Amino acid sequence: MAEELKKTTKEKTPVKKSSKVSASKAPTKKVTKTTEVKKADKLEKVSKPKSESTKVSKVSVKSVKTESIKSEPVKTKKSKIKVLSSKTNEAKNILFKNTVSLPKGIFGLSEEKINTQAIFDSILFERASQRQGTHSTKTRSEVSGGGKKPWKQKGTGRARAGSTRSPIWVGGGITFGPKPQKKYDFKINKKVRNLAFLSSLTLLANKNAILVEDLKLEKISSQELIKKLEDLKINNLKKILIVSDDEKIFKSGRNVQNLHVVKLNSLTVELLNETHALLLSKKDLTTLESRVK
């Protein structure tokens, strides 16, 4: 028994030595961790200036882009107008070469004098004055028939009825319907209307959307008119307004979808605000000047 106990003690002692060895190895692992942390810090320090350089390069690119964007509209303001085409709905730049200079009294109002509220009020005034007010409905007394009592007052079990033209019945009269005595028009001062007209013309002139051109046709033909608009490079616009007294232009332009031909007397503020291009003759310009004066 004593020998067996000695053997067991001998076997236990090397286990203690192994624990000491493991304890001695443990700090080496900690050292490796600290070295790895130091290496990572060095890599971050090396990588930081690169990221800063990339940021600087990005900022420089943005500044170049903004400068190029700001410089574009300054060039186009004087000569071009951006309009949506009717076929592709894409913006197009159109250059109008006017041989006649537009008078400043009509087309040169300052930004302070341009009044959008006057434009809005005048459009409402024009729409209200276009309403004729001829709508009408018939009351139970105006509808034909219905003089006979449909059934007797008592004994049928039905509700009482005195006429088949009662508003409750199908085919009867209408209660509180519209009558032609109503008027929708209202008044606006002449100064406000003139201000709206001039401000809408100046807005078109600021966009360079006014072209002074004497259109003439040999015969009534929509194809010839379209060819002339193609020569002016405005045939694909959504809305073109031509001011002319010529009957040939008026009749040949009725078949064109995006074209509206109007006399100078019937030119309205709403039409001026809807159009993308306005065609005027020299004669109409002189008449406009005389009216304003």
UniProtKB/Swiss-Prot annotation:
- The answer on whether this UniProt entry bears the keyword Glycoprotein reads no
Output the Gene Ontology terms for molecular function: rRNA binding; structural constituent of ribosome
Q: Name one Pfam family in it.
A: Ribosomal_L4
Set out the biological process GO terms recorded for this chain's protein: translation
Spell out the residue ranges making up region: Disordered.
1-72, 130-166
Q: Does the keyword RNA-binding apply?
A: yes
Query: InterPro entries under this entry?
Result: Ribosomal_uL4 (IPR002136), Ribosomal_uL4-like (IPR013005), Ribosomal_uL4_dom_sf (IPR023574)
Protein keywords: Ribonucleoprotein, Ribosomal protein, RNA-binding, rRNA-binding
GO cellular component, alphabetical, reads:
ribonucleoprotein complex; ribosome
Question: Cystine bridges: which residues?
Answer: none
Q: Residue spans with biased composition (Basic and acidic residues)?
A: 1-14, 33-55
**Assembly:** Part of the 50S ribosomal subunit.
**Role according to the record:** One of the primary rRNA binding proteins, this protein initially binds near the 5'-end of the 23S rRNA. It is important during the early stages of 50S assembly. It makes multiple contacts with different domains of the 23S rRNA in the assembled 50S subunit and ribosome.
HAMAP family, from UniProt? Answer: Ribosomal_uL4_B
Which family does the entry's similarity section mention? Belongs to the universal ribosomal protein uL4 family.
The protein's name in its UniProt record: Large ribosomal subunit protein uL4
